[in-house]
Amino acid sequence: MDTSRGIDSDLDHFLRYRLDTRYYVSPLNRLTFACSARWGYIEPMNTERIIANDQLFYLGGSANVRGFAENMLRFDTNNNPVGALSSTSGTVEARIDLGHQIELCLFTDSGSLGHYQTSNIPNGFRTSAGLGFRYLTPIGPVGLVYGFKLERESGEDPGRFHVSIGYTF
């Protein structure tokens, strides 16, 4: 739990709750399944019950739902990212050691935002699936992954490439 009390702004007066859990299992020598689930909620403590946009939860990008651009899981009519007071996301990833410090990853990511401060933003989970390769260096993996959006909305691109340094989780 994080607390924030703005110095000169009532917009930064809130409680932020977060839960992040991870699980890893290796049923075979060269195969690891990695699972992650995250939840967050912001409780406004100011009289207007409004939180500054830079303090809201956003989803999309290399850290969570990889089929989407950074923070673009939900967006407004002007194509600007929309944040929310609550966030739920999860990932299941298979990591396959191909030898020679190369790893293949297959994944599915899903996430949902809720309790928007603006109207006309749809609710519900958005999901992506994808694959990528990582080169395992002595200081951590460097990778290139592509996430495909499942159940694309009208006008959306099919997915997104992401370059990563380190594991997503």
Predicted regions located by residue number:
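Repeated loop/turn-to-beta-strand initiation elements of outer-membrane beta-barrel proteins
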Residues: 28-33, 100-104, 135-144
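C-terminal beta-signal and adjacent terminal beta-strands/loops
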Residues: 108-121, 139, 154
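Outer-membrane beta-barrel "beta-signal"
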Residues: 131-142, 158-169
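C-terminal outer-membrane beta-barrel translocator/porin domains of Gram-negative envelope proteins
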Residues: 1-98, 106-107, 114-115
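A short alpha/beta connector and helix-capping loop motif
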Residues: 119-132
